[in-house]
Swiss-Prot record:
HAMAP family: Ribosomal_bL17 (MF_01368). This is Large ribosomal subunit protein bL17. The keyword Isomerase does not apply. Keywords: Ribonucleoprotein, Ribosomal protein. GO terms for cellular component: cytosolic large ribosomal subunit. Belongs to the bacterial ribosomal protein bL17 family. Residues 136-189 are annotated as: Disordered. SUPFAM superfamilies: Prokaryotic ribosomal protein L17. It comes from Paenarthrobacter aurescens (strain TC1). GO terms for molecular function: structural constituent of ribosome. InterPro entries: Ribosomal_bL17 (IPR000456), Ribosomal_bL17_CS (IPR047859), Ribosomal_bL17_sf (IPR036373).
Amino acid sequence: MPTPTKGPRLGGGPAHERLMLANLAAALFEHKRITTTVTKAKRLKPYAERLVTFAKRGDLASRRRVLGLISDKGVVHELFTDIAGAVANRDGGYTRITKIGNRKGDNAPMAVIELVLEPVSPKQAVVAEATAAASKAAPAAEEEVVETEEAPAVEAEAAESEEAPAAEAEAAEAEAAETEEAPAAEDKK
C-alpha cells in the first residue's frame, strides 16, 4: 500500500497530483507568476523551490532530472539559464505566496505565487552583522558604565560629608527646574 502524500490533497490519484504539480511548476517558470488556489500554491512552493535548486546546480544530471518531471524543454531551458542565474546569490526562498481573496463562484481562497527574482540586497546581510556586533558590544559598554558610575559615587560620598549644605541647595535648584519643565510639557499636549 503506497504511503499517502503529506499535506492537502489536490484531488484525483497520486499520478494526477504529480502531473498537476508539474504543470503548475511549468506555468510558474514560464510566466514568473500564476494565480491559483491557496492549497495548490502551498503544495507548489516546495516543489518549485526544489526544481530551482536543481537548476542552480546546472549539471547534466540535474537537467535530466528536471526534464523527467517537466516535459517542456523550453521551460526547462528558461529555468536553467534565466531563473537560475537570477537567483544564484539567493539561498532558498525563491517563491512568494500572496493571498488575494476569494474566487467568485465557489468562494475558494485564491493566491498569487511568484518567483522572487530581485537580487538579494547586501544591506540586509550588513544589518544582520551590525545587530550581532551591537549585541556583543552592549554588555561590554554596560560594564564600562557600571565602573564609571561607581567611581563618581565614591567621590560623591566624600563630597557630601564635607559639603552637605551645598548639596541641599543643588537639590532645591533641581526641583525648581523640574517644576518649570512640567507646565511646558503639559502645554505641548
